[in-house]
Design a protein with these regions (language model features):
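RNA pseudouridine synthases
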Residues: 1-219
């Protein structure tokens, strides 16, 4: 049995740090915490500002929206950062998200391959744009259905900003708690008790940058 990493037993480490070794840190980022420093107010908390006082210097590899919770891997040295950047640039990691959406999808499974343009309107939303958009593909699978909403597994095959939210919007769906991407039929279907955007990065699979081992995390 593998011995528990003593670093994770430190009371100074947030309980949402799931794994760390000499090369990487894997976290289950809480909703509301920024992945990177805010461009207007750098003093606002973000992943590195919270973790670096305890774990030392960290390198960002990828990010989640502030409102999105879930799995992120960070590098602990420049070589690991370089290798993880290569993996993400070449779309090698497998990323699954869980989204609670409304209204009910008219399908159980669908793949949307539609190019996306970032900052496409005055609200700075990402929109499907077949002329100027970047290639983007998302697989959607309905996992369960409730009265007015459904839980959907979303698998990314590209990495455009707001990709899941924009692709769902193009399909006439919105994520519960998302104030930015709301199709006309969406508001009446929202759960009244939702206080955050119901999008969570639930699975992450990648290759360890030093050992070559396959790393798989669920949260």
């Amino acid at each position: 049995m593998e011995e528990e990493n003593p670093i994770l037993r430190s009371p100074a480490i947030p309980d949402w740090v799931l794994f760390t070794d000499e090369s990487i840190v894997v976290v289950n980022k809480p909703a509301g915490l920024r992945s990177v420093s805010d461009g207007y107010d750098p003093s606002l908390p973000h992943l590195r500002s919270v973790l670096e006082p305890v774990l030392g210097r960290l390198w960002m590899v990828h990010r989640l929206d502030k409102e999105t919770s879930g799995l992120i891997v960070l590098a602990r040295d420049a070589d690991s950062h370089r290798e993880l950047n290569r993996q993400f640039r070449e779309r090698e990691p497998i990323k699954h998200y869980l989204a609670q959406v409304a209204p009910q999808p008219q399908w159980n499974e669908i793949t949307l391959e539609a190019p996306l343009k970032v900052n496409a309107d005055r609200a700075h939303r990402t929109r499907v744009d077949f002329e100027y958009g970047k290639p983007a593909r998302t697989d959607f699978l309905v996992l369960r259905r409730e009265d007015s909403w459904a839980e959907v597994d979303c698998t990314l095959h590209s990495g455009v900003t707001h990709q899941i939210r924009a692709h769902l919007y193009h399909l006439g769906l919105g994520i519960l708690g998302d104030p930015l991407y709301q199709p006309p039929q969406f508001k009446a279907a929202q759960k009244s008790e939702v206080e955050r955007m119901m999008l969570h990065a639930s699975e992450l699979t990648f290759t360890h940058p030093k050992t070559g081992a396959l790393m798989h995390f669920q949260a």
